[in-house]
């Protein structure tokens, strides 16, 4: 929706003050066991029933920091501004996704050789949408765009190692490598949280594994400060 990190935090704070979402200044993506016990009741309050057992991939006491992940409180929202309604619906949608069944896919990667060259072909078959069905498969469509080299099929072929196949047709196309995409505020926030991820040296990357730039409460402000000092600037949805 194009919200800046600073605006997102401000809206989240407003939702918290209205008591319809939990504490916003958290870096955790997990909830504790005691909060998990309240999830079925929270789902009923927001009008959603999921089949049991609920998905537990977001439940981990060890990964909960001072505050757990942002979730709805179950209070009925009223008199929300447009931006507040957008962010609230995002929180609710992600909450439902988190406890929905896993998405199941079958993937295949095949390497062919003509004796000189080696070619790679990748394909995927969706078995069940699972949590992706919450937004009617929008995530599945996003996944397709992320891996343009992967062919989406309704069924995968049965192939055996060493099998000889006949060449039916061949085309030569030219491609160019692409640079890494520009940062968005979302990817920049992630990079700040995981500051050592791009470090190539193993020892340095491991040393920085638990380090980050700023905290969930200060990262948005750090970005705004850099913009005010003309070190970086916004260009549509990108940061340059």
Please describe what each predicted stretch is.
Residues 1-240:
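Core catalytic DNA strand-manipulation module of type IA topoisomerases
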């Amino acid at each position: 929706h194009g919200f800046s990190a600073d605006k997102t935090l401000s809206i989240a704070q407003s939702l918290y003050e209205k008591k319809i979402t939990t504490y916003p200044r958290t870096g955790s993506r997990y909830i504790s066991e005691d909060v998990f016990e309240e999830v079925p009741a929270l789902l009923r309050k927001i009008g959603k029933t999921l089949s049991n057992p609920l998905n537990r991939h977001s439940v981990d006491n060890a990964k909960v920091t001072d505050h757990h992940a942002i979730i709805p409180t179950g209070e009925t929202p009223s008199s929300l501004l447009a931006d507040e309604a957008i962010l609230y619906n995002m929180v609710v949608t992600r909450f439902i996704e988190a406890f929905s069944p896993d998405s199941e896919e079958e993937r295949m990667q095949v390497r062919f050789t003509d004796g000189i060259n080696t070619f790679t072909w990748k394909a995927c078959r969706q078995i069940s949408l699972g949590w992706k069905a919450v937004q009617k498969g929008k995530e599945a469509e996003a996944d397709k765009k992320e891996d343009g080299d992967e062919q989406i099929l309704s069924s995968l072929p049965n192939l055996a190692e060493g099998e000889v196949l006949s060449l039916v047709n061949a085309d030569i196309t030219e491609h160019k490598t692409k640079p890494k995409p520009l940062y968005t505020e979302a990817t920049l926030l992630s990079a700040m949280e995981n500051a050592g991820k791009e470090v190539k040296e193993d020892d340095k990357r491991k040393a920085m594994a638990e380090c980050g730039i700023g905290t969930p409460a200060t990262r948005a402000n750090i970005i705004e400060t850099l913009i005010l000092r003309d070190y970086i600037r916004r260009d549509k949805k990108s940061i340059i």
